[in-house]
UniProtKB/Swiss-Prot annotation:
Pathway of action: Cell wall biogenesis; peptidoglycan biosynthesis
Species whose genome carries this gene: Cereibacter sphaeroides (strain ATCC 17025 / ATH 2.4.3) (Rhodobacter sphaeroides)
Residue ranges of domain ATP-grasp in the record: 108-301
A cellular component term, taken from the record's GO annotations: cytoplasm
Enzyme Commission code(s) on record: 6.3.2.4
Function: Cell wall formation.
Identification of the protein by name: D-alanine--D-alanine ligase
């Protein structure tokens, strides 16, 4: 039944912050979404998620939760399981899809089984990566269960030896063949792939390029041949469905133009994409005619348990 605002879930708790390496990104997303939801007519409570989250939610008693958490605990199925246990409808993907997408190796297995184009990769420890080339260069080394390009190393084709890693790298690292070309991304909203964005940078699309002002330029819609645009949209939608995602997701791809459609590679699918007004997914929604408050409101009205 709709509340006084005409909304199914008039009182919303926005989860943000948390304890992962992506805390600052999450706070930015959370504050932006809170403001947008207030503009859309919701009563919003901001919640900096911590170990006392169950108690806080019991006190707040929201009709639904908007999950603006990023990284471990927030997008790996943990908080999703808590919300289902508490029977609070929530946004974005459920337990299984969130856990699969956060584990890059498991997600790749799902993608490959679905016939989606992925690149060669292996899982290795930091000691193994530093002892010798795990794959022929060029290749990329990154944590298997992190986002926002945290802890990413690129080993060039002419590298003299393996990379020297930071001492705090996690135990499980994904090492994958480096794919040259353009960085493309597609947001899926429900059962619709919105658009293709071409991410233009001076180098690797790392944490600074993603979040530093002027670090990258987003071209939406991407200037691509029609067949490549269609293929990107199709791959993102199939990836969303293969993982069992709900709400929105964003799939990142690389395109080696010299190989035509065969040069498209799916890198990963993010179940909790960045959510500031200038983030990639809201930009694509705006291209499709949805304001940021409308985009956030759609996610809240899509909320449910057992996702």
């Amino acid at each position: 039944m709709a509340g006084r605002s005409g909304r199914t879930f008039p009182r919303v708790a926005v989860l943000m912050g948390g304890t992962s390496s992506e805390r600052e990104v999450s706070l930015s997303s959370g504050h932006s979404c809170s403001a947008a939801l207030r503009d859309a007519g919701y009563e919003v409570t901001e919640v900096d998620a911590g170990p006392d989250l169950a108690r806080v939610l019991a006190e707040v008693q929201p009709d639904a939760v908007f999950n603006a958490l990023h990284g471990r605990w927030g997008e790996d199925g943990c908080v999703q399981g808590l919300l289902e246990w508490l029977r609070i409808p929530y946004t974005h993907s459920g337990v299984l899809a969130s856990a699969l997408a956060m584990d890059k190796a498991r997600a790749k297995e799902v993608f490959a089984a679905a016939g989606l184009p992925v690149t060669q990769s292996v899982i290795a420890t930091p000691d193994e990566v530093q002892a010798g080339h795990v794959l022929p260069p060029p290749y990329v080394v990154k944590p298997n269960c992190e986002g926002s390009s945290v802890g990413v190393y690129i080993v060039q084709a002419d590298a003299n030896g393996p990379p020297r890693l930071a001492p705090d790298m996690p135990r499980d690292l994904m090492v994958e063949t480096y794919i040259p070309g353009r960085e493309l991304t597609v947001t899926v909203m429900g059962d619709r792939a919105l658009a293709v964005t071409d991410i233009v940078t001076d180098g690797w699309y790392d944490y600074d390029a993603k979040y530093r002002p002027g670090g990258s330029r987003h071209v939406v819609p991407a200037e691509l041949p029609a067949e490549i645009t269609d293929a990107c949209l199709d791959i993102a939608l199939r990836a969303h469905r293969a993982l069992g995602c709900r709400g929105i997701s964003r799939s990142d791809l690389r395109w080696d133009e010299s190989r035509g459609a065969e040069g498209l590679i799916l890198l990963e699918t993010n179940t909790q994409p960045g959510m500031t007004p200038t983030s990639l997914s809201p930009e694509q929604a705006a291209h499709c005619g949805l304001s940021f408050p409308e985009f956030c409101a759609w996610m809240v009205e899509d909320a449910s348990c057992n996702r």
